[in-house]
Amino acid sequence: MARFLVALALFGVVAMTAATGDAPKEWSGKPWLGKFVAEVTDKSENWEAFVDALGLPEQFGRAPVKTIQKIYKQGDHYHHIFALPDKNFEKDIEFTLGQEVEIKQGEHIAKTKYSEDGEKLVADVSIPTKGKTIRSEYEVQGDQLIKTYKTGDIVAKKWFKKVANPTEAPAQAA
């Protein structure tokens, strides 16, 4: 169960999901808002060392998979939708900048706090029962989103290509 939580945190998906009402979805205003895709062949750096440092089982993150990150604002909240289409997985994370969100999975509680550092979106995840912390930074350079992951002294990166600023958020998974 703890490995599952670490895997979720690794992909930036540890948070609560909640209804947001009828506020319009905003896809612009921050450089990190939009839809970004990492294909199987896209660039990554130091990924296996990072996965090893988290103690994840083989099925999490070793083989390259298509990954989609969608981040938009709705009212006072943001949504970070993380999807692995080949694994039929999608998670919608609702967050407010600067506020910690907790999620309980079995006996474990993971805490996530999103904030801004200049033009970057930062997600700090703590899983106290595993003694793990993960920092993810989302930085846009041109038409690319560079996601930098850090745990302990291990740093890894993945590059995503900007696809678009959609006009509608996708339907939420149950």
Curated annotation (Swiss-Prot):
Write out the ranges of the annotated region (SAHS-c1).
26-57
Q: Annotated region SAHS-c2: where?
A: 72-100
Gene inactivation effect:
Results in a significant decrease in survival after desiccation but does not affect survival under frozen conditions.
Give a GO molecular function annotation for the protein: lipid binding
Checking SUPFAM superfamilies in the record gives: Lipocalins
* Positions of the UniProt region annotated as SAHS-c3: 113-162
Question: What family is reported?
Answer: Belongs to the Secretory-abundant heat soluble protein (SAHS) family.
Q: What does this protein do?
A: Secreted heat soluble protein acting as a molecular shield in water-deficient condition. Tardigrade-specific intrinsically disordered proteins (TDPs) are essential for desiccation tolerance by forming non-crystalline amorphous solids upon desiccation, and this vitrified state mirrors their protective capabilities.
Additional information: Trehalose, a disaccharide essential for several organisms to survive drying, is detected at low levels or not at all in some tardigrade species, indicating that tardigrades possess potentially novel mechanisms for surviving desiccation involving tardigrade-specific intrinsically disordered proteins (TDPs).
Share the domain note from the entry. SAHS-c1, SAHS-c2 and SAHS-c3 are 3 highly conserved regions within the SAHS protein family.
Q: What is this protein called?
A: Secretory-abundant heat soluble protein 68234
Q: Give the species this sequence originates from.
A: Hypsibius exemplaris
